[in-house]
């Protein structure tokens, strides 16, 4: 997709926002900064001087999860210096999508082949040997090893290297990333692993303010409600460190969304989407860099009261560069489903087309349809939706288990939510509240998804509908603690405070909602806030 084909999203005022963030985030190249704006990486090797800049560019790309381009760049180094062992290590690492997906047997075999090639070249320095040995621990040929086993072996090797080389920014940053990878899968030790990663990265962030991996991994390490504030400095830096990376332009939004900084998130993701589209045009990146940014962009528009802009993002899914028609339809269906539920447009949610979505997002669409039907009073439609969702969840969990992902042992949150609203529609309020409370507690324990409707907010909504505002406002307060500045959290808290006779509390929440949304907001509920504030 060329920028002139972005339809309404790239016209008029929005064109300003698409183009300027990229220019504004680029560092001044006259000061001696590298020509590729990917951050400063010093990665000494025994390879020839000719390929050393290529190696460092490839490592910088690796730190920003630009895996396709990183692999190509390492391969280029290997072509120009066939004895460069670390280039083979790099090609293996570019196959290891640590936070995105588990490598299958084919990928493990390909990675192991590269590591064996690196070992045969007998790298000259202990540092190179260390990186290659650590990667070998992950790619080792043991079919019975689980993914977590491989991560633990890899992380343990990096921990030893970092202890032997304290302050080494490359060993330290890769070690911290391995801890975040473990935290994503080893739920019993998640908090401890994240805390260790943060403790490793904090001093490195001060010592190496332009290093892409340190800032990037700090954002991932702190991507939970209780840690998000610790990641704000890294979030503010990362896009400026590596403005030529679409992922670097997007990643700050993980923290901005956690902290309810909607305008920051919007600017971040508009820039990331434009950069991702350009990279896809050049065949340097896959389409998901665009769609992931659009996911966060849509959510941020909704939370800042900009319904029309959120709907433009749905339409923009038709123009994602490099995506198949099936992928475009699936992404569009997913965004439409979340939008309908966020806006409480129950008829719209219940009428969402299912066939248009691809398998990955099918359960989200059916979840929205089931809740929409239940809240719209269509019991038959809700029951059918819940039944279909239960099957989709079972299939999803089978695929997940087959791929090596560890299950939580808990009923899926989306299924609990749909079942709860069905029970509520049937008049079984105690059962409904019990289901939502269990879903909310599970979500809170695991950090919750940053761009989804919190189950606890649904619980608060249900309590308010049951005319139990004192209980509802307690739940809304918890929602706003974990997900600050959520539109419906603030609106629900204001309504609950008003229902309990707390005029000062209602005024405070309505005022906060009006401030968060600003002049460009168009959600009709804002009229309620303005009317209340005008009366006071």
Feature locations, PLM:
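Alpha-helical segment of the N-proximal tetratricopeptide repeat
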Residues: 47-76, 132, 136-144, 368, ...
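TPR repeat positional signature
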Residues: 54, 88, 95, 130, ...
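Solenoid-like repeat scaffolds
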Residues: 79-80, 162-164, 205-207, 236-244, ...
């Amino acid at each position: 997709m060329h920028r002139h084909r972005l339809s309404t999203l790239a016209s008029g005022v929005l064109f300003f926002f698409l183009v300027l963030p990229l220019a504004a985030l680029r560092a001044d190249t006259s000061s001696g900064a590298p020509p590729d704006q990917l951050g400063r990486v010093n990665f000494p090797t025994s390879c020839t001087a000719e390929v050393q800049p290529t190696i460092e560019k490839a490592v910088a790309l690796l730190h920003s999860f630009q895996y396709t381009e990183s692999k190509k760049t390492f391969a280029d180094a290997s072509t120009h210096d066939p004895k460069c062992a670390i280039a083979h290590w790099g090609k293996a690492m570019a196959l290891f999508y640590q936070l995105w997906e588990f490598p299958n047997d084919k990928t493990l075999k390909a990675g192991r082949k590269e590591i064996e090639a690196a070992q045969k070249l007998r790298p000259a320095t202990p540092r190179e040997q260390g990186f290659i040995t650590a990667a070998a621990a992950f790619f080792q040929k043991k079919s019975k090893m689980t993914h977590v086993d491989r991560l633990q072996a890899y992380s343990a090797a990096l921990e030893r290297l970092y202890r032997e080389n304290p302050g080494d920014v490359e060993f330290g940053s890769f070690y911290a990333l391995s801890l975040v990878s473990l935290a994503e899968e080893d739920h019993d030790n998640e908090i401890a692993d994240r805390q260790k990663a943060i403790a490793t990265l904090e001093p490195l962030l001060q010592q190496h303010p332009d290093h892409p991996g340190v800032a990037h991994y700090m954002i991932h390490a702190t991507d939970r409600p209780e840690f998000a504030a610790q990641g704000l400095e890294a979030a503010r830096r990362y896009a400026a460190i590596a403005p030529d990376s679409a992922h670097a332009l997007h990643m700050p939004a993980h923290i901005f969304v956690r902290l309810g900084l909607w305008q920051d998130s919007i600017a971040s993701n508009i820039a990331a989407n434009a950069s991702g589209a350009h990279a896809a045009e050049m065949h340097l990146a896959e389409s998901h860099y665009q769609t992931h940014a659009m996911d966060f962009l849509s959510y941020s528009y909704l939370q800042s009261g900009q319904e029309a802009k959120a709907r433009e993002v749905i339409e923009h899914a038709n123009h994602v560069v490099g995506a198949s028609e099936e992928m475009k339809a699936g992404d569009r269906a997913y965004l439409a489903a979340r939008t309908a539920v966020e806006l409480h447009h129950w008829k719209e949610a219940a009428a969402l087309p299912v066939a248009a979505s691809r398998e990955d997002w099918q359960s989200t669409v059916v979840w929205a349809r089931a809740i929409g039907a239940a809240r719209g009073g269509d019991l038959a439609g809700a029951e059918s939706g819940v039944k279909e969702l239960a099957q989709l969840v079972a299939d999803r969990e089978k695929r997940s288990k087959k791929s090596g992902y560890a299950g939580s042992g808990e009923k899926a949150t989306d299924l609990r939510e749909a079942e709860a609203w069905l029970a509520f529609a049937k008049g079984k309020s105690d059962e409904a509240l019990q289901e939502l409370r269990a879903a909310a507690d599970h979500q809170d324990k695991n950090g919750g998804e940053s761009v989804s409707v919190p189950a606890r907010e649904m619980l608060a909504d249900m309590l308010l509908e049951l005319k139990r505002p004192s209980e509802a406002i307690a739940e809304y307060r918890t929602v706003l603690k974990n997900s600050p500045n959520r539109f419906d959290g603030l609106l629900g808290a204001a309504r609950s405070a008003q229902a309990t006779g707390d005029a000062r509390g209602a005024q405070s929440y309505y005022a906060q909602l009006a401030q968060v949304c600003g002049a460009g907001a168009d959600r009709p509920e804002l009229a309620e806030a303005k009317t209340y504030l005008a009366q006071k």
